[in-house]
Amino acid sequence: MIETLYNLPFHILVPPNIKVRRFSIPMPSPMAVFSVILFSYFLVTGGIIYDVIVEPPSLGATVDEHGHSRPVAFMPYRVNGQYIMEGLASSFLFTVGGLGFIIMDQTHTPGKTNLNRLLLTAMGFIFILVSFFTTWLFMRMKLPSYLQP
């Protein structure tokens, strides 16, 4: 019964004979997908959502003992607040640390010489250490008594 109702318009109207090409999007390369994911990771860890909602200044300012205004890159004593440049610097360090882990993972691919494995391991380890200690230093700049007994 319902099928006859569906077929009724096609008995009255004749649909045109059109050849429609199938629309296809080429599959992106793995490096393009990785780049998009890494860039979105950079933006999210940099606090782009916070920056859009709160609209903080790019840099802060403080007055020294002589009355001069000095630029400040880190918002002191506030863990849940940031300047735009502070978020971008921290995000860059998180991304460098993540790249260090990815570089260290590349040492396990077959066909690498021992020298290349050693260089990749050293470079990945250096990326991770620089990222960790610089992020730790940034946290000490935000909270001067951070991890102090």
Swiss-Prot record:
The organism's place on the tree of life at top rank: Eukaryota
Subcellular location: Membrane
Gene Ontology annotations for the cellular component aspect, listed alphabetically: oligosaccharyltransferase complex
Keyword Membrane: yes
Membrane topology: Multi-pass membrane protein
Residues spanning the membrane: 33-53, 84-104, 118-138
GO biological process: protein glycosylation
Keyword Secreted: no
Keywords recorded for this protein, A-Z: Membrane, Transmembrane, Transmembrane helix
Pfam families: OST3_OST6
Extracellular topological domain: 54-83, 139-149
Residue spans, topological domain Cytoplasmic: 1-32, 105-117
Role according to the record: Subunit of the oligosaccharyl transferase (OST) complex that catalyzes the initial transfer of a defined glycan (Glc(3)Man(9)GlcNAc(2) in eukaryotes) from the lipid carrier dolichol-pyrophosphate to an asparagine residue within an Asn-X-Ser/Thr consensus motif in nascent polypeptide chains, the first step in protein N-glycosylation. N-glycosylation occurs cotranslationally and the complex associates with the Sec61 complex at the channel-forming translocon complex that mediates protein translocation across the endoplasmic reticulum (ER). All subunits are required for a maximal enzyme activity.
Family label: Belongs to the OSTC family.
Subunit structure of this chain's protein: Component of the oligosaccharyltransferase (OST) complex.
Identification of the protein by name: Putative oligosaccharyltransferase complex subunit CG9662
Lineage: Eukaryota, Metazoa, Ecdysozoa, Arthropoda, Hexapoda
